[in-house]
Amino acid sequence: MAHEGEKHMNWAEEIVKTLKDWDTSMIVYVPDISIHQVTSLIDEDPYFRLVSATREEEAIGIAVGSYAAGRNAAVFMQSSGFGNSVNALASLCIPARTPIPMFINLRGGPGEFNLAQVAMGRAVIPIMDQLGLPHFVLEDDGKMDKLLDGAMKLCHANRQPLAICLTQMLHGGKIA
């Protein structure tokens, strides 16, 4: 809860703050309307370098290259695209011990209107479990600052990729 005179940050502002707190200035994303609120804030901020990728595995490759060059990176994608990134994660990011936080718009939950999103949305967490990929699900912005900071600490201390799944309950979802 915000104190007198403090403005409560929304979920997108909280993510931007956390990325800055963890010196994560290279942001690679596959465009998606549900994450537009956060990527537009990033795009407006000169601290960040925002790179649009055509596919999710390309985004992972760019982020790993950025980290190898000395610049912390994060990736934003949709859950259906997470399926596209599995090989890049399993054969590059995980064995190279690259700390890449991935912010994933998790589709297929309450309020989903597109049946094609449901199967992959349900498969994301079990796939992450099989890869040994730590993951957290954000359904509201309560204690979001602590969860994001803890996730970033885990990601960097263990030098491993990590997923932060953003649900439709958090960001409002897509409109049919």
Residue spans of the language-model regions?
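Thiamine diphosphate
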Residues: A2-A176
